[in-house]
Amino acid sequence: MNIVKTDVPMTSQLCHETVLALAERYPSIRAETMTETDFGRPVDLMMMGKGERKVIFTAAHHANEWITTPVLLKFAEELAQALESGGRIFGVPAQTLVKAATIYIVPMVNPDGVDLVTGAANRREVARAAVFAENYPGIPFPDGWKANLNGVDLNLQYPAGWLRAREIKFAQGYTRPGPRDFVGRAPLSQPEVKALLLLTEAVEPDLVLAFHTQGEVIYWQVGGIEVPGARRMGEEFSRLSGYELADTPEESAYAGYKDWFIQRYRRPGYTIEAGLGENPLPLEQFDKIYRDTLGIMTTAATGLPGE
């Protein structure tokens, strides 16, 4: 019987309980809490494998993109099941994968925001967010919410052109806490982001994947920086998923997790914009999203021949 639920809206409690249950059921999954949000919700981390190659997968930087969380949870569960049965995942022997790679999975970077969008936030939190939302009446509430409960967009918090991101977003009118695109008062001001940055600095991974929605597109570079091997890997991701491989738009090329990673380490980093439609995407899209991205996750972990 599967532990990961893919047919109900995701909440921070469901994510946390799922992570704990997976770690209890499968010895191949190790779990810990990276940090807590300002509102006391845990930001979970799962680790699998003990290989030399290191990769970090993240999901739900943005609240209304929570469908990416069960994608990573299901990947972890299917890999653990394949290890138990001596089977394969996306055609790759599970034992081969975990001997080659160590996989770090952060399934929900923004638990506060996710709870707001999926109806699990408490009354006081909803009221606080509603006040922020009043500054942006053109954004649906709560479905248009991407930020955390401080009204800060977590994927605009990294020290990679943060001042330029602020300039762009302020010019677009995002000058105060709200549902989306507010960069905060300073980079790394939010504990969720600081914890992920510290994890990344501790691990120094060979590659990172940041799962978002939507558009069925893969963004692979930033600021004209072309990391050796990154295009080749991106083209393979595109082939496996059917997603377009695209340059990051200039207005979105600053202060994001993938942007910071590429600038900091000159290693491959990818934003995976899964699914199609208007966020939050319906759960009816989950199966297709998972099928489309399973090869990306598996190949990111194994690497390409000759790497």
Region roles according to the model:
Residues 1-18, 25, 164-307:
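C-terminal accessory segments enriched in acidic
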Residues 7-53:
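Soluble metallo-hydrolase cores and metallopeptidase-like ectodomains found primarily
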Residues 31-34, 85-94, 245-249:
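Surface-exposed patches in mature extracellular/periplasmic domains of secreted proteins
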Residues 34-36, 48, 59-61, 106-111, ...:
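Active-site-proximal beta-strand/loop segments in catalytic clefts of secreted hydrolases
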Residues 47-49, 146-147, 162, 260-266:
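Short glycine/proline-enriched loop/turn "hinge" motifs that connect secondary-structure elements
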Residues 52, 67, 74-76, 80-219, ...:
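Active-site/substrate-binding loop(s) of hydrolase catalytic cores
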Residues 54-56, 270:
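Conserved beta-strand elements of the Class I
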Residues 63-69:
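Di-metal (Zn2+ and/or Mg2+/Mn2+) metal-binding site signature of metallo-dependent hydrolases
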